[in-house]
Amino acid sequence: MDNIVIELFLLSIGASFVQRTTGFGFGIFIMTMLPSIMPSYGEATTLSGILAMTTSLIIVIQKYKYITWRRLLPILFTFIIISIGAIFVLKRMEYHILNILLGITLIIVSIYFAFFSKRIKVKTTLPVQVTAGTLSGLMGGFFGMQGPPAVLYFVSSEPDKEHYLAMTQTYFLAGNLMMTLARAYNGFFTTTVSIGYVYGIAGVIIGNLIGSWVFRHLSGSLLKYIIYAYIGISGLTFLLET
């Protein structure tokens, strides 16, 4: 039990630090190990979601003035609808093939954006927002990792890193809240999840403080390449685990 508490605490520090520094990645970081210490995969995604939601809430309170709702609401509503549907079929999913496809996709996307990001200009049109929200909803519902599609949209559409961080965290806060309700309805919000949250919340606060300091010293261009690199590493991690 003591080892599990320590693991949850350290995982929460690392995941919160990544989220605060890059604007995403809490689920990607913590879900590499969390399923191995939780009773079920559904409970692991639920705990990851509420810890990530807490991280996002802290950031939204700090960055609220940078939110532009007209660029946020279409992708957010699409994400909520798709992710809830994905959660309802979670118990019937076969993860082996999906993990391989997810890993390959993340690697290809990260390489493409790293080399061609200067040529890519994402327009905030409804089709683009719906597409990003759909992909994000599928990844969030199945894997608890809704970040990459939404992040690639926001990092290209937002004028600076402050707007980027405000938009991503508001998106993740609302999305994780709705997914948590859906997971609770499906029986994934258990006593074990509640206890895990108590153990992890201190780590979330510490990781957020450290990440906030690092974020202030990052340039916008460097932040983009860190994001692309982390997406690629996440994809490689999926392939190796599979």
Task: Identify what each model region corresponds to.
Residues 44, 85, 89-90, 95, ...:
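Hydrophobic alpha-helical transmembrane segments in multi-pass integral membrane proteins
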Residues 79-87, 95-115, 199-212, 220-242:
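Selective transmembrane alpha-helices of multi-pass membrane proteins
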Residues 43-115:
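Membrane helix-loop-helix hairpins that form the core translocation module of multi-pass transporters
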